[in-house]
């Protein structure tokens, strides 16, 4: 018997990442090749944005995806989020010229407060929320704090792009396929401060750290390359990474819903105090997923270099949180 359709909301649906994301969701890449979906697409209530969204929906129709059971366009989160199973919060205020980081934080705080409140009222209480729009960890924190009736654990931020970037850098360094690498971790904020950590990683069952055996490469090449990869893409392409971000969002939700078969992945999730990260901070941690739930990998040894990096990215998150505290009622 055919499965009942799942409802997926995507915000910023006519944007660059949205355009790379929607066709893959409708093709079954997000929730499985046997799972029909209904897309509930949110854009700002601006005539140009709504018109662009109508054009994207025309293209989605023209693909005649067997799994696309329906789609609707919205300018209000209260209708866009009605009865949804999954929310991909992609739309965020980009940083404009001359804009201070604190201005960016407060502009996004307004967006994510409104969206969190709407999720709280109209979404399913089991909704799985992924924030892609930057600053992703703090935006996820704002949405979580604005939705007290939805479990905090349902709010996540996207660290999977950093995770995938780190995987490919290691695969290139070792001249091996990415699929052979397991147990990579990316700690912290989705920003250049995040800490990709391959101390536990294996390739074909052998230690990646022992295979590379180069602390200087780790510190001076690997970590900065992963941290600055987004900027390098803007420099090369003139536009920010959209297809790779959409791909990471698909990976994140796909694994959360359908499981990782014991493989470690990185998700930005609310801390419960693990690894001395204060409770409620949405921080990149290693997890495995099964039966629609993620479970943190606990008890990993944190050496001095790692603790320093983990604290550095934590401090940035705490600073961002402090910058929006007054905006959260």
Swiss-Prot record:
GO terms for biological process: malate metabolic process; tricarboxylic acid cycle. PANTHER family: MALATE DEHYDROGENASE (PTHR23382). This is Malate dehydrogenase. HAMAP family: Malate_dehydrog_2. The keyword Oxidoreductase applies. Substrate binds at residues 95, 101, 134, 165. SUPFAM superfamilies: LDH C-terminal domain-like, NAD(P)-binding Rossmann-fold domains. Its EC number is 1.1.1.37. CDD domains: MDH_chloroplast-like (cd01338). GO terms for molecular function: L-malate dehydrogenase (NAD+) activity.
């Amino acid at each position: 018997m055919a499965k009942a359709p799942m409802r997926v909301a995507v915000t910023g649906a006519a944007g660059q990442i949205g355009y790379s994301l929607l066709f893959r969701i409708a093709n079954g890449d997000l929730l499985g090749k046997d799972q029909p979906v209904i897309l509930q697409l949110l854009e700002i209530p601006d005539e140009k944005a709504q018109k662009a969204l109508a054009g994207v929906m025309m293209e989605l129709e023209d693909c005649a995806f067997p799994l696309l059971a329906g789609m609707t366009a919205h300018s209000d989160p209260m209708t866009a989020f009605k009865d949804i199973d999954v929310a991909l919060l992609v739309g965020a205020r980009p940083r404009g010229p001359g804009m201070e980081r604190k201005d960016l934080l407060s502009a996004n705080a307004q967006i994510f407060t409104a969206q969190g409140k709407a999720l709280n009222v109209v979404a399913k209480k089991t909704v799985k929320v992924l924030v892609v729009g930057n600053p992703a960890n703090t935006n996820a924190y704002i949405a979580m704090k604005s939705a007290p009736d939805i479990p905090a654990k349902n709010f996540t931020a996207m660290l999977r792009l950093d995770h995938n970037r780190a995987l490919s850098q290691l695969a290139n360094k070792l001249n091996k396929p990415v699929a052979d690498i397991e147990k990579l971790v990316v700690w912290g904020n989705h920003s250049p401060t995040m800490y990709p950590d391959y101390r536990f990683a294996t390739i074909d069952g052998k230690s990646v750290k022992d295979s590379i055996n180069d602390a200087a490469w780790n510190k001076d090449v690997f970590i900065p390359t992963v941290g600055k990869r987004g900027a390098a893409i803007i420099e090369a392409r003139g536009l920010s990474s959209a297809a790779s971000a959409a791909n990471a969002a698909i990976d994140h939700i796909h694994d959360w819903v359908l499981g990782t078969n014991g493989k470690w992945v990185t998700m930005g999730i609310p801390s419960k105090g693990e690894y001395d990260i204060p409770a409620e901070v949405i921080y990149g941690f290693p997890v495995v997923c099964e039966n629609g739930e993620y479970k943190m990998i606990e008890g990993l040894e944190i050496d001095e270099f790692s603790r320093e990096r983990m604290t550095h990215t934590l401090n940035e998150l705490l600073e961002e949180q402090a910058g929006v505290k007054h905006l959260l009622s």
